[in-house]
Amino acid sequence: MRSIIALVLAVLVLVGTVLSIVRARAWWIRIWDFPRVQLAVLAAAALALGWDRWLRGWPWTALGVLLVAALAFQLMLVWRYTPLAPREVQRSRAADDGRRISIMISNVLQTNRQADRLLAVARAADPDIVLCVETDDWWRARLDALATTHPHAVRCALPNTYGMLLYSRLPLEDVREERLVEPDIPSVQARVRLRGGARVWLNCVHPRPPAPGESDESLPRDAELLLVGKRVRDASDPVIVCGDLNDVAWSRTTRLFQKVSRLVDPRKGRGLYSTFHARVPLFRWPLDHVFHSDSFRLVALRRLPYVGSDHFPVFVALSHEPPAAAEQEAPTETSEDLQEARETVQEGRAQGASTG
């Protein structure tokens, strides 16, 4: 019986690993980008269960070798998001509030009705900026309670699970609500004035995921992320990109986004900070992200308590310290990376225009 279970697990791991490598955008292929940790655990379980089989003839030995290779491949992709890896963003030791900015991001789940729970978490975390997605008019009416402490707001409530509400206690300038790729998917850009006077270019996104009932392929999501990455790469102001990206940190698209945008990820060397699925611990991965310029250092990063949604909120506090740019290494792009990003954006916009 152990051998049968080991064989079934091995086949599942190998199929999932191979499909995740395939350069195709179909949702049923791209979905295998997500469960890297789960596939690694299943690979280890299969190796342990079949320990007395792997040297009994070449078919079993070959399967064992492939399983070890799959385990190594999965671990290679996720190890950067463990405390074993070097930190991409240094810890800030500055105590200057004038340089700091804190953000709470929450996918509220549009059908969730525990608004009081979310408001309590937001008040306890006390961020400078609250970004909520999947917000409709019902959520707008409840979350407007934040306006008493966060009077600078951008409201784009929608009934299609892609609404976006932004509340800030810091002044917002040059605010834009755009539909970057698809006509029904908004994003928000604004310049945030820090207490010390510096301006930060904030980009809030929530692209459509590749999933049944959403999109048959990952092109709309990939194009939006890479378009934002291209926009911010040469920005004169420091940049923060945040939101529910509907992608994991280790996917090819997110890694390409990081290289094209030249932004850093504070989770590297610290942990996964998995936010989805809040109610299913065995199937949980990081979908809610914050990327920023290398001129920021990290003050705090934590996952916040459950708010009734299928996502946990996440909180990040950053300190703008320009000398950090010389000490923190942002990812760099190649000409091939830029070409791939350019082609993806062009394809995504063409598809969005044809369907809009």
Language-model regions, residue ranges each:
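Glycine/proline-rich, flexible active-site/cofactor-binding loop segments
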Residues: 49-80, 185-206
